[in-house]
Amino acid sequence: MTHNQRVGKWGEEQAALYLGQRGYNIAARNVRTPYGEIDLIADKDGQTVFVEVKTRLSDSAGPPETGVTGRKQSHMMASAEYYAQEHDLEHWRIDVVAVQRLAGQTDVVHFENAVA
């Protein structure tokens, strides 16, 4: 596993813990679709939440959420629509969780309905 893969897995774990503490049930991780991978799939209050996790260990490239480009959003939407259709889901949304570790402190920011 590469350094970036380890960082990504660590960030996904931090995001899952954060969401779990806020009442989300993590139903699946790293789900592949023909359009890309969905990092986390969670359920809360009868709604399925597709979660893109962005992780950074420095601020040199800006905050993690800036990594969610227009192209990435298109892939996220296509992946979510594919999964929702395959699983007959009516109520769903796409969130982004940004995880950043600076000076020994981990910050997690949750953006609900980040892609519409």
Which functions belong to the PLM regions below?
Residues 86-116:
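Domain-level recognition of nuclease-like catalytic cores that cleave nucleotide substrates
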Residues 34-36, 104:
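Short acidic/glycine-enriched loop/turn segments that link adjacent beta-strands
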Residues 19, 38-61, 70, 76:
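Conserved catalytic cores of phosphodiester-cleaving nucleases, focusing on short active-site segments
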Residues 1-29:
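Acidic-basic catalytic patches of nuclease active cores, encompassing PD-(D/E)XK
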Residues 25, 48, 91:
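Hydrophobic "anchor" residues on beta-strands that sit immediately upstream
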Residues 59-90:
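Mid-chain, well-packed structural core segment of small domains
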Residues 22, 29-30, 44, 110-114:
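Secondary-structure boundary/capping motif
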